[in-house]
């Protein structure tokens, strides 16, 4: 049995706590809302974020970071990207020496343009940095909570740390693979939220399956293009954290990014969408960061650019779609063709 500190009492933190409890581990789930912690401890349910799912008595809620972290073998960071730095700063005085950090959030920090593992490296003491692990893949919390079959990927610079997390989570309902390509895993997980927003917009506009299929396919090309330029392995984007996560996020009503995009497609303004959602929509912040990354690495990302225009410059969604369809003609495998031609030269 391992002691696990789950930093974050949202839907994903709760669902992962359930997996860990099923595996016989003791989970201390930290959250800052006292009424939510009381729910978890007294009703054994998270009515706000994962209603209808009974939680094991081995999952204990706390609003005290020192209590959550005491003796923890693993520390799972399950808070939104924008809160990670603040939470880590508060946690620093209480981190046990033997702990392995795992992050399960999908995003990129705007302005700094850091992946989450890089952000964590800036905040954590040196002895913890080499063992940071990312757990990512096509995994809606609602389905994990119901113990539906789910597969994800564990990635780290240290393969032993990735394998330790694989062993920690893996069971008959929750299969975990390892992948040493941390860059590709994080970029795929973050950028799919952009394409999910766009997929929701096309559905909100009533454009049908043809448009969505094109969007997912060309969206994957954008993700792979940027991810490879940043040092990721191209093969990673055809795996669970690339095409797998993209499919599940672009086609499911469980996806908050898809739901937000759907509202945008139906004519809601961004502020109204975020207010109506009542939950973090990572794709909005990630769109800004990915647009900045596309400029930095000089990578063509037309879908990301179009969504950036809609979200931050007030462009109508119909106009954005028209601009995408009116782009100059090109080869579908443009990057491969250019690479081949350069080699021939």
From Swiss-Prot:
Gene3D superfamilies: N-(1-d-carboxylethyl)-l-norvaline Dehydrogenase, domain 2 (1.10.1040.10), NAD(P)-binding Rossmann-like Domain (3.40.50.720). One of its GO terms (cellular component) is cytosol. It is found in: Cytoplasm. It is an enzyme of class 1 (oxidoreductase). NADPH binds at residues 11-12, 32-33, 106, 141, 256, 280, 282. This is Glycerol-3-phosphate dehydrogenase [NAD(P)+]. Belongs to the NAD-dependent glycerol-3-phosphate dehydrogenase family. Catalyzes the reduction of the glycolytic intermediate dihydroxyacetone phosphate (DHAP) to sn-glycerol 3-phosphate (G3P), the key precursor for phospholipid synthesis. One of its GO terms (biological process) is phospholipid biosynthetic process. Pathway: Membrane lipid metabolism; glycerophospholipid metabolism. Its EC number is 1.1.1.94. Sn-glycerol 3-phosphate binds at residues 106, 137, 139, 192, 245, 255-257. HAMAP family: NAD_Glyc3P_dehydrog. SUPFAM superfamilies: 6-phosphogluconate dehydrogenase C-terminal domain-like, NAD(P)-binding Rossmann-fold domains. Keywords: Cytoplasm, Lipid biosynthesis, Lipid metabolism, NAD, NADP, Nucleotide-binding, Oxidoreductase, Phospholipid biosynthesis, Phospholipid metabolism. The keyword Coiled coil does not apply. The active site is at residue 192. One of its GO terms (molecular function) is NAD binding. Its main location: cytoplasm. It catalyses: sn-glycerol 3-phosphate + NAD(+) = dihydroxyacetone phosphate + NADH + H(+); sn-glycerol 3-phosphate + NADP(+) = dihydroxyacetone phosphate + NADPH + H(+). The gene is gpsA. Pfam families: NAD_Gly3P_dh_C, NAD_Gly3P_dh_N.
């Amino acid at each position: 049995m391992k002691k696990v500190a789950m930093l974050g009492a949202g839907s994903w933190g709760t669902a992962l706590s359930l997996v860990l409890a099923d595996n016989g581990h003791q989970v201390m789930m930290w959250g800052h809302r006292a009424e939510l912690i009381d729910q978890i401890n007294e009703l054994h349910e998270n009515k706000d974020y994962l209603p209808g799912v009974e939680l094991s008595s081995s999952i204990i809620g706390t609003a005290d970071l020192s209590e959550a972290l005491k003796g923890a073998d693993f520390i799972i960071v399950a808070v939104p990207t924008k809160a990670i730095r603040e939470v880590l700063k508060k946690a620093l005085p209480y981190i046990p020496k033997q702990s392995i950090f795992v992050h399960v959030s999908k995003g990129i920090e705007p302005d700094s343009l850091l992946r989450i593992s890089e952000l964590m490296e800036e905040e954590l003491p040196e002895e913890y940095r080499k063992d940071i692990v990312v757990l990512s893949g096509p995994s809606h919390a609602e389905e994990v909570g119901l113990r539906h079959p789910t597969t994800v990927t564990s990635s780290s610079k240290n393969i032993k740390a990735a394998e330790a997390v694989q062993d920690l989570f893996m069971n008959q309902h929750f299969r975990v693979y390892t992948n040493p390509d941390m860059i590709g895993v994080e970029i795929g997980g973050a950028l799919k939220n952009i394409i999910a927003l766009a997929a929701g917009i096309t559905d909100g506009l009533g454009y049908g399956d043809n448009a969505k299929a094109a969007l997912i396919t060309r969206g994957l090309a954008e993700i792979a293009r940027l991810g490879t330029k940043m040092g990721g392995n191209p093969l990673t984007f055809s795996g669970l954290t690339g095409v797998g996560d993209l499919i599940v996020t672009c086609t499911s009503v469980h996806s908050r990014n898809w739901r937000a995009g759907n509202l945008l497609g139906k004519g809601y303004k961004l502020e109204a969408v975020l207010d109506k959602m009542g939950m973090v929509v990572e794709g909005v912040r990630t769109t800004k960061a990915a647009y900045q990354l596309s400029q930095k690495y000089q990578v063509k990302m037309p879908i990301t650019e179009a969504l950036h225009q809609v979200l931050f410059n007030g462009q109508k969604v119909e106009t954005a779609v028209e601009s995408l369809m009116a782009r100059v003609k090109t080869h579908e495998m443009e990057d491969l063709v250019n690479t081949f031609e350069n080699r021939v030269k």
